[in-house]
């Protein structure tokens, strides 16, 4: 099973000549199938940590590894391949392409992997049915509700069956009813396909469903539930 881990991870920013430390000396190990929630106050560094773990940002110091491959040893193209073949992403806002249909939006990761064929068409249809958006397959995003848009975002993220799914406030822009539905779908897909969940969230209902809960406070990552 694949393992994503960081060792002695720190990140700071320079603002007007002052150094602002966001996270300091963080160590974390996540294996396929794990469910990890990271909470903390706004600005605590939750999203920053997710960005670094997902190879979308670089730490000031420390290392991130996927199965012993050091991200620091890879080129930008190498990191893109890591993300394409191992990671999925769902954000607070769906980030769908407005001029593409539901089906076309979901097909993007498969197209990037040069895997768009008759077999992948079956996979896309299956994923849409699992997330109850098959009847919307030809709709453009503007015709969808907020909850439906987030389902499409989840479908796009999991259609390639990634090993790790990064979730940055995935229920933050939804009402309670839709948030509950999205929460259930995320965990259902994780359990079904063994996808690890790594989420930054303020949603207490969402947090309570995770097996491992961490909090970033004072630049440190502390485990508060296992």
PLM feature spans:
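Conserved ABC transporter NBD signature motif
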Residues: 62-70
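Short coil-to-helix segment of the ABC ATPase nucleotide-binding domain corresponding to the Q-loop/switch region
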Residues: 100-107
């Amino acid at each position: 099973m694949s393992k994503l881990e960081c060792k002695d991870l720190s990140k700071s920013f320079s603002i007007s000549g002052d150094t602002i430390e966001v996270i300091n000396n963080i160590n974390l190990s996540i294996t396929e199938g794990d469910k990890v929630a990271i909470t903390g106050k706004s600005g605590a560094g939750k999203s920053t940590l997710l960005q670094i773990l997902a190879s979308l940002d670089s730490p000031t110091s420390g290392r991130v590894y996927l199965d012993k491959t050091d991200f620091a040893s890879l080129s930008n193209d190498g990191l893109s391949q890591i993300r394409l073949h191992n990671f999925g992403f769902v954000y607070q806002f769906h980030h769908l392409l407005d001029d593409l249909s539901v089906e076309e939006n979901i097909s993007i990761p498969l197209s990037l992997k040069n895997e768009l064929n008759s077999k992948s068409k079956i996979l896309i249809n299956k994923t849409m049915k699992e997330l109850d958006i098959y009847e919307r397959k030809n709709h453009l995003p503007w015709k969808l509700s907020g909850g439906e848009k987030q389902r499409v975002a989840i479908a796009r993220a999991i259609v390639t069956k990634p090993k790790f799914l990064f979730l940055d406030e995935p229920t933050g822009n939804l009402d309670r009813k839709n948030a509950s539905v999205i929460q259930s779908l995320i965990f259902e897909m994780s359990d079904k396909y063994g996808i690890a969940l790594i989420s930054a969230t303020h949603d207490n209902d969402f947090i309570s469903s995770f097996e491992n809960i961490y909090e970033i406070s004072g630049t440190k990552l502390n485990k508060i539930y296992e």
